[in-house]
Amino acid sequence: MERRPELTIIAGPNGAGKSRLCPFYVSAKSFDGDKLMLDLRREHPDWPDRWVSGTVVSQLEKQKAEALEQHKDFAFETNFSSDMVLHMIEDFRAAGFKISLCYFGLRNEDESVSRVIHRVQTGGHDVADDVIRFNFHEGLKNTQQHLRLFDNLTFIDGNSDYGHIVALHISKSQTHKVVDNPPLWFKEQFEELFNGL
């Protein structure tokens, strides 16, 4: 039996360690729009924001189309703060892809802001406070509302150095596990929903 290709949504708040930790959990090279935007701004400091944003979107669409056409694994990094992720899931599911979520969690928006400040101090990219707060709340709400869209779920603690797995759900094998003492963010934000799957 041929292996189904997989779309992996790498989600979580700003500063949760998505870019740093996802290579340990996702074999497909992930599309990281924030990194591409940062690279474009460095290479083309004279470009207006709309050119940079437009280039990021066109690159995402190009890589998405290539993955769909070639039936190859694709990973996409996001805060899940918009409906774009839902449209992407629809497109990949219609093409026969398995859909997985790899979620990196933090306790609250202040923790997210603090981690972005630390990231900037160590040479990483910045995100405005109001955007971080919006992404935290909208991303959390969308993730909570749409857990059932995913065939596989992996929740990872963004506060741990190496990204400890907190909970795992694999539909095909009916695997459904939560660590004995999950972090508070998982208990408060996801445990009840996760246990209802």
Task: Describe each region flagged by the PLM.
Residues 97-145:
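A glycine- and Lys/Arg-enriched "phosphate-lid" helix/loop adjacent to the NTP-binding pocket
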Residues 7-9:
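Short hydrophobic/aromatic beta-strand immediately N-terminal to the Walker A/P-loop
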Residues 18:
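Conserved lysine of the Walker
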Residues 13-14:
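The conserved Walker
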Residues 147-197:
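NTP-dependent small-molecule kinase module
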Residues 22-72:
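Conserved substrate/cofactor phosphate-moiety recognition/catalytic segment
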Residues 1-4, 67-68:
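Phosphate-binding P-loop
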Residues 52-106, 139:
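Glycine-rich phosphate-binding loop used to anchor ATP phosphates in small-molecule kinases
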